[in-house]
Regions:
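Post-signal peptide N-terminal segment of mature Sec-exported envelope proteins
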Residues: 37-59
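Bacterial N-terminal signal peptides that target proteins for export
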Residues: 2-17
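Bacterial signal peptide processing site
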Residues: 29-32
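C-terminal motif of bacterial Sec signal peptides marking the signal peptidase cleavage site
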Residues: 23-27
Length: 182
């Protein structure tokens, strides 16, 4: 008798949970960000990227222009505008040990670790009314091996800045696509 009551209640509970889960999943708004029906690609192609200062800022801007329109360049008539402000810093992450294994203590002449931290603040506005749609700050870090030779160190730092600029542009583009896809 008790097992019949338990069996009946377990079937009722299972049915209720199935109906509840179906209701929750029906309200789910998951859709592809770059899908055909979303129109996000067309909106991204209508975004112009304003001029920015500095070499790394120009790298981010060039990559954003390429990513927004799929290599087609700036739009002739932009519906949206994005202003990007980029800053970058390169530092050594060398750790000083006291067991005579550091570069300074044993004439180590190999590369030592470093990193480039790049931050970008951007503002996305609608051209027609000047409304700010999104304003955010993103940052990325690129690791780098810094050799002892000065020119090689400059080149390695520049390569790390270029990698960080490409990554920052992709993050900003994804963020803008999510904003325009709403």
């Amino acid at each position: 008798m008790l097992s019949d009551v338990f069996s009946r209640w377990s079937r009722v509970a299972a049915a209720i949970s199935v109906v509840t889960m179906a209701g929750l999943l029906a309200g789910c708004q998951v859709r592809p960000l770059y899908g055909e029906a979303s129109g996000t690609k067309e909106r991204l192609a209508a975004v112009s990227v304003s001029e920015t200062g500095g070499r790394v800022g120009q790298e981010v801007r060039n990559q954003l222009i390429f990513l927004m329109a799929g290599g087609a360049g700036q739009p002739a008539t932009a519906q949206y505008n994005v202003k990007v402000f980029v800053s970058s810093s390169a530092t050594s992450t060398e750790v000083q040990n006291y067991d005579l294994t550091t570069r300074a203590n044993n004439n180590y002449d190999g590369p030592y670790p470093g990193r480039v931290v790049m931050s970008g603040q951007y503002v996305l506005t609608r051209v027609s009314d000047g409304q700010i749609l999104r304003s955010a700050r993103r940052s990325v870090t690129a690791q780098v091996d810094l050799p002892q030779q000065e020119f090689a160190k400059i080149r390695a730092t520049r390569d790390a800045e270029n990698r960080a600029a490409r990554e920052l542009a992709e993050i900003i583009r994804t963020d803008i696509a999510a904003t325009l896809g709403r």
